[in-house]
């Protein structure tokens, strides 16, 4: 007979004819080799019949696992971060709750944002594309893993996007098409990921006939289009025939500016391979950083760390160049 009111571990134990500790082992997934298979099945049957749901707060006192993983990210409106979160959520499954911690203003976070994440007493934290000051000042309070912060990340396991390969893939593709004059557009950002993207490409084309660079203060494609409409004429007159952007959002602005100028023959490449890149005209050639895959790897690594106490190794997720019409190769 099912009792009214909240069902607890004691009721499950009575129903299954076992101890409360046996119930705890089963519901926390720690029963392997410690109780019989027959007892495990009895406990699971009682859990199902009674509709028992473990009290997460009580469980955290015993296991040290609050059941919450915090993801700290810069800009929730950027579809790339949505891909990372989707992969992270898939890896965490039903066992952990994914809590998003966002900047209170602007499109980037600082050390205070990370402190807000730690104040939730999470089982683990994932920092997505953090800036240099965040990494420099960070004092981890629980298993903390970084996604997309290449370079010297002190004392933190990380999942890297292959930003170095991105520069190589783009430069090899464009030079194979005969381009010798390049423009590069990036953000005014302290983030390691954008420094690496910039350096990887510019080092690869250091002997180009023409090389122009520009840093923009934001990611708004419309603002980028306005700025580039005034900059591109000089670039093109100097011999620039291909423009590379550190992010697809900037590339959309470049495509719009080129369309306004009637210079559709200029090649444009982005990074991130956002969903809209297939739909814009011309369709944008872009580097796919496999954001969903990076999120899955980060989630699995963090869960293993939480469960075993063993720090995961650094992982790099391969990048791939998706060639489309904007470089006349697709």
Residue ranges of model-derived segments:
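N-terminal helix-turn-helix DNA-binding module of bacterial transcription factors
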Residues: 1-64
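Hinge/beta->alpha junction and helix N-cap segments in small-molecule ligand-binding domains
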Residues: 56, 74-83, 101-109, 159-169, ...
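Short beta-strand segments enriched in small/hydrophobic residues
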Residues: 20-25, 62-75, 173, 181-187
């Amino acid at each position: 007979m099912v009792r009214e009111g909240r069902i607890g571990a004691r009721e499950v134990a009575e129903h299954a004819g076992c101890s409360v500790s046996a119930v705890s082992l089963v519901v926390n997934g720690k029963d392997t080799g410690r109780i019989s298979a027959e007892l495990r099945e009895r406990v699971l049957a009682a859990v199902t019949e009674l509709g028992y749901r473990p009290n997460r707060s009580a469980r955290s006192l015993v296991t040290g696992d609050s059941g919450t993983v915090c993801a700290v990210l810069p800009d929730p409106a950027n579809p790339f971060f949505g891909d990372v979160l989707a992969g992270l959520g898939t890896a965490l499954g039903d066992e952990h709750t994914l809590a998003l911690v966002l900047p209170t203003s602007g499109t980037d976070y600082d050390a205070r944002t990370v402190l807000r994440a730690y104040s939730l007493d999470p089982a683990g934290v994932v920092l997505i594309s953090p800036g240099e000051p965040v990494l420099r000042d960070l004092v981890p309070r629980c298993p903390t893993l970084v996604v997309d912060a290449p370079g010297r990340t002190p004392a933190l396991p990380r999942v890297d996007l292959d930003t170095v390969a991105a520069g190589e893939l783009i430069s090899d593709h464009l030079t194979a098409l005969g381009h010798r004059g390049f423009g590069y557009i990036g953000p005014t950002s302290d983030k390691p990921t954008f420094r690496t993207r910039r350096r990887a490409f510019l080092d690869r084309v250091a002997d180009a006939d023409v090389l122009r660079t520009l840093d923009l203060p934001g990611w708004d494609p419309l603002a980028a289009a306005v700025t580039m409409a005034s900059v591109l004429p000089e670039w093109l007159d100097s011999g620039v025939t291909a423009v590379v952007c550190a992010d697809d959002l900037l590339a959309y602005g470049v495509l719009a500016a080129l369309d306004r100028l009637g210079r559709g023959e200029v090649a444009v490449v982005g990074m991130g391979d956002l969903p809209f890149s297939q739909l814009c005209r011309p369709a944008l050639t872009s580097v796919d950083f496999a954001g969903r895959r990076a999120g899955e790897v980060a989630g699995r690594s963090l869960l293993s760390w939480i469960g075993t106490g063993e720090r995961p190794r650094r992982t790099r997720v391969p990048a791939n160049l998706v060639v489309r019409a904007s470089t006349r190769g697709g």
